Amino acid sequence: MQSFETLEKLLGYSFKNQELLIEALSHPSLRQHHEYKYDKDYERLEFLGDAVLNLVVTEILFRNFASYNEGNLAKIRSYLVCKETICVVGTKLTLKDYIIMTYGEEVAGGRDNPNNIENAMEALIAAIYLDSNIETTRNIIGKLWEEFIKIQNLTDYDPKTALQEWAQASSHHLPIYRLIKREGAAHSSTFTVLVKVKDYEQTGTGHSIKEAEKNAARDLLHRLQDV
């Protein structure tokens, strides 16, 4: 297990109360085995962290997406606080290396379990909030989620770049575009392009290949917000 000091450097935050940090990283399996002598785990902090993350993300979207209506804001928030996004953030922090768990949980694959990474990440947010204040927590979440929020800003006017950044942020291969159909006369052709990222595919049409690629990327990004 790595030292907590390394994790704190990655977060850009040093805990005043180390007990909060330990609690945020303690898997529930520890309480089920008395030989480990842990009387707390991250479940209560996870509950609070989920609410804090939703509040902070909602506020960030409200301030930065003034032209978006309630429905669009809700879709973006769902994407930013979904399990996959939280897991990506936790993975970038190498959070799995810091979770304290029983030997049995570890050999069962618990360190790589996305649920454990998500839960610990939410608990860590709550621990930061309790150890500091909402402003500090807002700044840390803003930094950790920055690339995902940036993607939302790019989606409408530069969806190809937004999709590429989403792929990179999610540790996937870069998008692959393929022309699959061309219809109509030479001066008024309609092009259909297929874009693929990991297991996700989407088609888009346009009066040029560039336009078709842009539409495919935008539609795929909108789909990914609902995943």
UniProtKB/Swiss-Prot annotation:
It comes from the Bacteria. Residues 4-133 form the RNase III domain. NCBIfam families: RNaseIII. Its EC number is 3.1.26.3. Homodimer. It catalyses: Endonucleolytic cleavage to 5'-phosphomonoester. Belongs to the ribonuclease III family. Digests double-stranded RNA. Involved in the processing of primary rRNA transcript to yield the immediate precursors to the large and small rRNAs (23S and 16S). Processes some mRNAs, and tRNAs when they are encoded in the rRNA operon. Processes pre-crRNA and tracrRNA of type II CRISPR loci if present in the organism. GO terms for cellular component: cytoplasm. The active site is at D50, E122. It is found in: Cytoplasm. GO terms for biological process: mRNA processing; regulation of gene expression; rRNA processing; tRNA processing. InterPro entries: dsRBD_dom, RNase_III, RNase_III_dom, RNase_III_sf. CDD domains: DSRM_RNAse_III_family (cd10845), RIBOc (cd00593). Pfam families: dsrm, Ribonucleas_3_3. Keywords: Cytoplasm, Endonuclease, Hydrolase, Magnesium, Metal-binding, mRNA processing, Nuclease, RNA-binding, rRNA processing, rRNA-binding, tRNA processing. The gene is rnc. Residues 158-226 form the DRBM domain. Its cofactor is Mg(2+). This is Ribonuclease 3. Mg(2+) binds at E46, N119, E122. GO terms for molecular function: double-stranded RNA binding; metal ion binding; ribonuclease III activity; rRNA binding.
